[in-house]
Amino acid sequence: MKIDVDYAIAQYAQGLFLMADDRHGLGWYSSDRHALIPLDDQFRYPKSLQRVLNQNRFQVKINQAFTAVCEGCAARPETWISQELIEVYHTFHVAGWAHSFETWHGDRLAGGILGIAIRGAFIGESMFYTIPEASKVAMVKLVQHLRQRSYQLFDAQLQNPHLKRFGAYEVEEKAYKKQLEKALNYRCHFTSEPDLYD
């Protein structure tokens, strides 16, 4: 799929997101409710995870294995991430929008989170792991990273029991768009590279 990156990022900035399905290829979707990961003191995680964090079992890297993270996120029996969508994410990545936040165990990619960063908003697209606890560690470290860089919004899109363990909560579309609009007023850089959305 050939995609206009500027148009696509503008769609994300309006609260839409891309998904693949078997019948129609890629399409733009919206949701009545969005799951948000809190970036304040409402963020939490299981006590058992603190032991893993204290052990420093995993190392964190950013954008070192972007394609592998996309493929890891897509490697499940039911997935909305097609090969076509992976190629689109790669286009976003080359343009500076899409990022992979990774956990490594030695020289092995253990897990990661795929997302799109637009100014003060981080839109989490998917996550995966190959070693237990790796994606949970990635979540904790990503929240720390977003806080350090003054991000205002972490959109995890769809609520699930796993996200609830981190304090994820749902907001309706109208409230979400207000928070998104506010976040887009902040100039945040996910990496040391300047944000392109001006």
From Swiss-Prot:
- Any one Pfam family here would be Leu_Phe_trans
What Gene3D superfamilies has UniProt attached to this entry? Leucyl/phenylalanyl-tRNA-protein transferase, C-terminal domain
Q: What is the protein's species of origin?
A: Synechocystis sp. (strain ATCC 27184 / PCC 6803 / Kazusa)
Cite the HAMAP family for this sequence.
Leu_Phe_trans
Q: What is its EC number?
A: 2.3.2.6
Reactions accelerated catalytically: N-terminal L-lysyl-[protein] + L-leucyl-tRNA(Leu) = N-terminal L-leucyl-L-lysyl-[protein] + tRNA(Leu) + H(+); N-terminal L-arginyl-[protein] + L-leucyl-tRNA(Leu) = N-terminal L-leucyl-L-arginyl-[protein] + tRNA(Leu) + H(+); L-phenylalanyl-tRNA(Phe) + an N-terminal L-alpha-aminoacyl-[protein] = an N-terminal L-phenylalanyl-L-alpha-aminoacyl-[protein] + tRNA(Phe)
Subcellular location per the Swiss-Prot or TrEMBL entry? Cytoplasm
List the Gene Ontology MF annotations in alphabetical order.
leucyl-tRNA--protein transferase activity
Give the protein's biological function.
Functions in the N-end rule pathway of protein degradation where it conjugates Leu, Phe and, less efficiently, Met from aminoacyl-tRNAs to the N-termini of proteins containing an N-terminal arginine or lysine.
InterPro entries, per the entry = Acyl_CoA_acyltransferase, Leu/Phe-tRNA_Trfase, Leu/Phe-tRNA_Trfase_C
Which NCBIfam families does the record match to this protein? aat (TIGR00667)
Q: What protein name applies here? A: Leucyl/phenylalanyl-tRNA--protein transferase
Hey, which family's this protein in? Belongs to the L/F-transferase family.
Instruction: Provide the alphabetized UniProt keywords.
Output: Acyltransferase, Cytoplasm, Transferase
Q: Which PANTHER family match?
A: LEUCYL/PHENYLALANYL-TRNA--PROTEIN TRANSFERASE (PTHR30098), LEUCYL_PHENYLALANYL-TRNA--PROTEIN TRANSFERASE (PTHR30098:SF2)
Please cite one Gene Ontology biological process associated with this protein.
protein catabolic process
